[in-house]
A protein has these predicted regions:
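Conserved AMP-binding/adenylate-forming
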Residues: 6-11, 15-33, 38-138, 145-148, ...
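AMP-binding/adenylate-forming catalytic core of the ANL superfamily
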Residues: 102, 107-108, 130-212
Length: 212
């Protein structure tokens, strides 16, 4: 741990809450941002509220793992049903696609009008990221649309499973993908690296932990 606070900005793949908690306890003050090349970099920030400082560290990490709210330069940010373009409910559970609008969003893909038309269908830039909207207006990513696992007609977030796996005290690394299944169409398949200190941890131990 450091003897002083180190300010860090994290982006790209959504960090598990356990990783954020470990970083904070080591003296890093984490700021979580989200964006794409098409939005000129970061366009969303998990703006911190002082009242959250009183939350337990684990709850602070859970709160900070959300992507957040729009930067001031962004005209609008919504989570919409990509088929109907209806807004999702702010209930932190209804899944939709994250969409952007504003002058920090690109005009289009170079010499690719078809891709540009598809990306801006309905007047919004489609990010390809799936997420939920919280009652306080903060968004949280759940998966890439191409990575979501559809099992028996249900959408399963690979990111949520990975986040659960990282909570296991003996898990060092985790990655979840879809595996073809004759009955369900797809089922989650996890690739896990255990810590060197792990003893006697089995596949069934990991499965039972996730179920609990």
């Amino acid at each position: 741990a450091f003897d002083h606070t180190v300010e860090v900005m994290t982006a790209a793949a959504p960090p598990p809450a356990t990783v954020l908690a470990a970083m904070e306890s080591a003296g890093f003050a984490m700021t979580h941002v989200y964006g794409l090349t098409e939005t000129y970099g970061p366009a969303v920030i998990c703006a911190w509220h002082s009242e959250w400082d009183d939350l337990p560290l684990a709850e602070q990490a859970e709160t900070k793992s959300r992507q957040g709210v729009p930067y001031h330069m962004l005209e609008d940010l919504k989570i919409l049903d990509p088929e109907t373009m209806d807004a999702v409910k702010p209930d932190a559970s209804q899944l939709g696609e994250v969409m952007f609008r504003g002058n920090i969003v690109m005009k289009g893909y170079l010499k690719n009008p078809k891709a540009t038309e598809e990306a801006f269908a309905g007047g919004w830039f489609h990010s390809g990221d799936l997420g939920v909207l919280y009652p306080d207006g903060y968004i949280q990513l759940k998966d890439r649309s191409k990575d979501i696992i559809i099992s028996g007609g249900e959408n399963i977030s690979s990111i949520e499973i990975e986040d659960t796996l990282y909570r296991h005290p003996d898990v060092l690394e985790a990655a979840v993908v879809a595996r073809p299944d004759n009955k369900w169409g797809e089922t989650p398949c996890a690739f896990v690296t255990l810590k060197d200190t792990a003893v006697g941890v089995t596949e069934q131990n990991i499965i039972d932990f996730c179920r609990d």
